[in-house]
C-alpha cells in the first residue's frame, strides 16, 4: 500500500536481526559450513515442528511477539515469533480477567518459560553454555512477554537439537524482569544510531526523489517505456519488456523505479544482471541521477573471488587477517562508510574495507543492508544457496522492486542454479582422502558409491532416467552429516578445498531434492571425460523463480532479445505478466539485413566445399567497404575450418577469439576496434561467447556483424531431455530446447552493430534455415525488410547499401 506523508514513521526489525547485528563479534570462519544452507533450514523447520508437537498442552508454538519503542521522530517496532512459550492457559486467562476488572497483576500467580529451539548438524552435547546471540534472541522474547503480562520473573530455555541424531541438550536460566529490562534497553540504545540514520536518510531520499526529473530528452518511444514500467510497478505486476538496443532501457527502468519508491510503491531496488559490463552501466546511471540531485544510496556487489585481497581465498582467522576479528570492527566501519557518499562500487568498497581491516566482501554485503539500490548478479536474489539472506530469509516478503537486465540469460542461469550434479569419481576421491578419519564417514561414502555403481551398470546406452531416489537422498544426507562432523574438527590437510566443494554439492543436492516438482528430471550418464554422473536437472525453472519473485513487490524483465516473449514468460514466472515491445529509435535505412540462402551449418552439409562457400560470403561482404567486422561462428572448430579458406592479404587483418581468454586478453582483443586504421579488421568470434553480447562498439568501430549458422545448441542429453519434457507438455520441444536458445544467440550477436542513432552497418545471417518460418517467426520486427542473397551477389548488394549511405552524406 502506498505510504502517506501524514503517517507516523515506523521502522521494523526482527528480534533475530537485531541481536545478530548488534551483538556479533569474533572471526569469519568458513571451515564449518552448512549452518545457513537451505537444506539445514528445511531440516530445522521439520525438527521445530516435531518438538513443538510433542511438547504438551502447555506448550504454545510460534507465538508472535511485538514491542514498540517510541522516539520523537518515529516508532521502532521489534517483532518476532518465539519458537515456544510454556505456560498454563488458565493462569493467563485469570491474569487477563483480573486486568480487565482493574485488579493488580501483582496478585496473580503466573509462570512462563520461553523456549528457543536451534537445530544444527554440530554435536550439541559438546556445548557447555548457550551461544550468545541465541540466548539474546530468547531474552528479547522473554522481556517482551514479561512486559506484556507484568511478570516479575520469567524462565528462558535454550533447546539445541542435532538435525541427524535428534539428540537434545537444554540450558535453562531464570531472569527477573528488572534485569531483562535493563539488558533490553541497553540493546536498543546500541541500535538507536542506526535507526536514526535510516529515518533521516529516507526523509532526505524521498525529498530528493520528489524533485527528480528525467535526466535526458526523451527519445522516440522512451517516455512510453518509462510509463509502462512505472504502471507495472504500482500495480505490483511482472512486466516483460522487449527493448531494442538504443532505446535507453537502463535509465528507462531505473528512473520509473526510483520515482515509484518516492511515491511509496517500494523501498529498495535490485538491479540484476549476468554481466559485469551491464552492472557498470547501471552504476553510471545511478551516478547520473545523483548528479541531478538524487540522494539514494547505491552499492554494486562484486563476487567474492573478485574482491578478495588474496590470490587464494581462505576465509578463516588462521589464513586471513581481515577474517580475524572482522565482526568486532565491521559495524563501526559500515556506519562511517555510509557517511562518505552515495554510489559505492567495487574499488570504493575495497579500499575502505582494507583501510578498516575488514573482509571487503562481507563488508559490502553489510553496506547493502543500508542502501536503497543494489546492483548485483542474478544469484544474489534467485539462488537459494547464495541469495542475500538479510533480505530474502525464509518467508519474508519485502518492499523490493526487481529490475532484471539481459533477462534472456536468466533461463539457463536459473536451470544451473536449481540443478546439481554428483560425480561418482568425486565420491570415491573424497572417500579415499577421508578413509582414516572415521569408519562411519567411510561407510556413508561407500553406500553412495555403491548406489551410483548400480546405476552405472544399468546405463548401457546414452543415459538412464530415474524416478525413485529416496535411498540415495538418505545416503547423501548421512554422508553430508559425517563430513560436517569432520569439518568441525578444523583439521588442516591437503585437498581441503575439494572436500568442501564436495560437501557443498551434497548440501545443494539435499536442498534441491526437498522441493522437487514437475519441473525436474533425474538421470545418470557418462560425461565427456568418461566419468559417471548423477544429475538432478531443472528443466523448467519457472516455479522456483516465482518463489523468489514473490519475495518482492514487482518485477521488470527486460532485454533487447526477449523473443518469442511467450517462451520467456513460460520459463521465468508462473503468474500472468504484462508484455510490451518498445519501439526502436533507429532509422532502418541505416541498417541492412542480408540472409544467405546457399549455405548451412547443418552437420550433414559440413564439408570443405561448404566451409569455402562461407569464406567466400565473408570475403565478399568485407570487400564492399573497408572497416571493422565481427564474424560469429557456432564453435571454435567451425571457425578454424572457415579460417583456412579465408583470403589473406595485406588489406585486411584477421584476429581470432581464443578459448578461456583472460580479462587482459579480452581487453587487448577489443582495443583493436579502437585503433585508427586504413585496412579492414575481421574478428572471428564464437556465438554466445564473451564478445557476442554486452560490448558497445559505436560509430565506425564496428560496421558489420556476420552470423554463421543458427546458433542451435549441440545435441546432448540435457537438450534431448528438455525436448522430451516440452513435447510431453504440449509444446514444440525442438523450438524450446534448440531453436529459441539458438536464435537468441543470433540476435544478441547481431545487436553488436548499430548502437547509436548515428551508426550505420550491415548484418548478414548466413544459413538457409533463416528463411524457414519457425526461424523467421523469432525475428524482431526491425528485421522484416531483410534481403535474400547468395555468395555471388552479396558483394553487389553490400556495395549498393554503402553507396546509398555515401550519397546521403553529400
Each predicted region: which residue ranges?
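A contiguous, basic/glycine-rich beta-loop/short-helix subdomain that forms a polymer-engagement track
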Residues: 349-369, 374, 385-392, 485-601, ...
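Conserved RecA-like P-loop NTPase helicase motor core
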Residues: 597-609, 658-771
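Signature of the SF2 helicase/ATPase Hel1-core->accessory helical subdomain module
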Residues: 253, 356-373, 377-480, 560-575, ...
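Conserved pre-motif I regulatory segment
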Residues: 200-242, 255
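Metal-dependent nuclease catalytic cores that hydrolyze phosphodiester bonds in DNA/RNA
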Residues: 1-95, 99-110
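Mg2+/Mn2+-dependent nuclease catalytic core
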Residues: 67-181
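A substrate-engagement module of RecA-like helicase motors
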Residues: 206, 212-213, 265-374, 382, ...
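Conserved helicase motor "Helicase C" RecA-like lobe of SF1/SF2 P-loop NTPases
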Residues: 634-658
Amino acid at each position: 500500500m502506498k505510504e502517506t506523508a501524514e503517517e507516523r514513521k515506523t521502522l521494523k526489525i526482527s528480534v533475530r536481526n537485531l541481536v545478530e547485528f548488534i551483538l556479533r563479534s569474533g572471526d569469519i570462519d568458513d571451515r564449518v559450513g552448512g549452518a545457513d544452507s537451505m537444506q539445514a533450514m528445511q531440516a530445522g523447520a521439520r525438527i521445530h515442528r516435531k518438538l513443538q508437537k510433542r511438547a504438551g498442552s502447555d506448550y504454545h508454538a510460534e507465538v508472535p511477539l511485538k514491542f514498540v519503542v517510541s522516539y520523537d521522530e518515529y516508532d521502532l517496532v521489534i517483532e518476532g515469533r518465539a519458537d515456544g512459550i510454556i505456560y498454563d492457559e488458565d493462569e493467563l486467562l485469570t491474569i487477563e480477567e483480573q486486568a480487565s476488572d482493574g485488579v493488580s497483576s501483582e496478585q496473580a500467580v503466573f509462570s512462563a518459560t520461553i523456549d528457543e529451539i536451534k537445530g544444527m548438524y554440530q554435536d550439541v552435547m559438546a556445548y557447555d553454555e548457550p551461544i550468545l546471540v541465541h540466548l539474546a534472541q530468547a531474552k528479547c522474547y522473554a522481556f517482551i512477554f514479561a512486559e506484556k503480562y507484568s511478570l516479575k520473573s520469567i524462565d528462558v530455555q535454550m533447546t539445541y537439537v542435532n538435525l541427524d541424531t535428534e539428540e537434545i541438550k537444554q540450558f535453562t536460566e531464570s531472569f527477573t524482569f528488572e534485569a531483562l529490562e535493563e539488558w533490553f534497553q541497553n540493546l536498543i540504545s546500541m541500535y538507536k544510531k542506526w535507526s536514526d540514520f535510516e529515518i533521516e536518510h529516507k526523509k532526505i531520499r524521498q525529498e530528493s526523489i520528489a524533485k527528480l526529473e528525467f535526466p535526458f530528452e526523451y527519445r522516440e518511444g522512451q517516455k512510453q517505456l518509462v510509463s509502462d514500467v512505472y504502471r507495472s510497478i504500482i500495480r505490483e505486476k511482472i512486466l516483460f519488456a522487449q527493448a531494442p538496443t538504443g532505446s535507453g532501457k537502463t535509465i528507462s527502468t531505473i528512473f520509473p523505479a526510483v520515482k515509484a519508491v518516492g511515491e511509496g510503491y517500494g523501498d529498495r531496488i535490485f538491479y540484476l544482471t549476468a554481466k559485469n559490463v551491464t552492472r557498470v552501466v547501471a552504476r553510471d546511471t545511478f551516478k547520473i541521477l545523483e548528479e541531478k540531485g538524487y540522494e539514494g544510496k547505491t552499492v554494486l556487489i562484486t563476487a567474492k573471488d573478485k574482491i578478495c585481497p588474496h590470490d587464494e581465498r581462505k576465509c578463516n582467522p588462521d589464513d586471513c587477517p581481515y577474517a580475524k576479528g572482522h565482526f568486532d570492527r565491521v559495524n563501526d566501519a559500515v556506519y562511517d562508510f555510509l557517511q562518505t557518499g552515495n554510489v559505492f562500487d567495487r574499488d570504493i568498497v575495497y579500499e575502505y574495507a582494507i583501510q578498516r581491516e575488514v573482509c571487503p566482501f562481507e563488508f559490502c554485503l553489510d553496506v547493502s543492508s543500508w542502501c536503497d539500490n543494489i546492483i548485483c548478479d542474478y544469484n544474489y536474489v534467485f539462488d537459494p544457496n547464495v541469495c542475500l539472506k538479510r533480505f530474502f530469509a525464509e518467508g519474508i516478503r519485502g518492499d523490493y522492486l526487481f529490475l532484471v537486465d539481459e533477462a534472456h540469460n536468466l533461463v539457463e542461469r536459473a536451470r544451473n542454479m536449481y540443478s546439481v550434479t554428483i560425480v561418482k569419481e568425486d565420491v570415491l576421491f573424497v572417500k579415499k582422502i577421508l578413509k582414516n578419519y572415521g569408519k562411519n564417514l567411510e561407510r556413508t561414502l561407500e553406500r553412495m558409491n555403491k548406489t551410483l555403481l548400480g546405476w552405472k551398470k544399468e546405463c548401457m546406452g546414452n543415459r538412464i532416467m530415474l524416478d525413485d531416489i529416496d535411498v540415495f537422498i538418505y545416503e547423501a544426507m548421512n554422508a553430508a552429516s559425517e563430513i560436517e562432523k569432520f569439518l568441525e574438527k578444523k583439521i588442516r590437510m591437503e585437498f581441503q578445498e575439494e572436500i568442501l566443494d564436495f560437501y557443498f554439492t551434497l548440501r545443494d543436492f539435499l536442498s534441491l531434492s526437498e522441493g522437487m516438482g514437475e519441473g525436474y528430471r533425474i538421470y545418470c550418464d557418462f560425461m565427456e571425460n568418461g566419468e559417471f554422473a548423477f544429475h538432478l536437472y531443472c528443466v523448467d525453472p519457472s516455479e522456483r523463480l516465482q518463489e523468489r519473485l514473490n519475495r518482492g513487490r514487482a518485477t521488470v524483465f527486460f532485454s533487447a532479445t526477449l523473443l518469442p516473449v511467450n517462451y520467456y514468460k513460460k520459463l521465468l514466472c508462473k503468474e500472468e505478466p504484462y508484455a510490451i515491445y518498445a519501439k526502436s529509435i533507429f532509422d532502418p535505412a541505416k541498417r541492412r539485413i542480408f540472409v544467405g540462402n546457399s549455405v548451412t551449418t547443418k552437420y550433414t552439409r559440413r564439408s570443405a566445399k561448404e566451409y569455402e562457400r562461407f569464406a567466400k560470403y565473408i570475403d565478399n561482404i568485407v570487400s564492399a567497404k573497408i572497416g571493422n567486422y565481427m564474424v560469429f561462428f557456432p564453435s571454435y572448430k567451425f571457425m578454424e575450418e572457415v579460417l583456412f579458406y579465408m583470403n589473406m592479404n595485406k588489406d585486411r587483418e584477421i584476429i581470432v577469439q581464443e578459448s578461456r581468454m583472460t580479462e587482459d586478453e579480452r581487453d587487448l582483443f577489443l582495443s583493436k576496434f579502437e585503433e585508427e586504421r586504413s585496412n579492414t579488421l575481421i574478428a572471428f568470434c564464437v556465438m554466445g561467447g564473451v564478445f557476442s553480447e554486452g560490448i558497445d562498439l559505436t560509430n565506425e568501430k564496428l560496421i558489420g556483424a556476420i552470423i554463421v549458422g543458427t546458433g542451435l545448441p549441440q545435441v546432448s542429453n540435457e537438450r534431448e531431455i528438455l525436448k522430451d519434457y516440452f513435447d510431453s507438455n504440449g509444446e514444440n520441444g525442438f523450438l524450446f530446447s534448440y531453436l529459441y536458445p539458438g536464435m537468441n544467440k543470433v540476435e544478441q550477436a547481431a545487436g553488436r552493430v548499430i548502437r547509436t542513432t548515428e551508426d550505420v552497418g550491415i548484418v548478414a545471417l548466413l544459413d538457409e534455415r533463416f528463411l524457414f518460418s519457425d526461424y523467421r517467426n523469432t525475428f524482431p520486427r526491425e528485421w522484416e525488410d531483410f534481403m535474400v542473397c547468395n555468395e555471388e551477389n552479396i558483394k553487389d548488394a553490400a556495395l549498393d547499401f554503402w553507396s546509398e549511405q555515401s550519397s546521403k552524406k553529400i
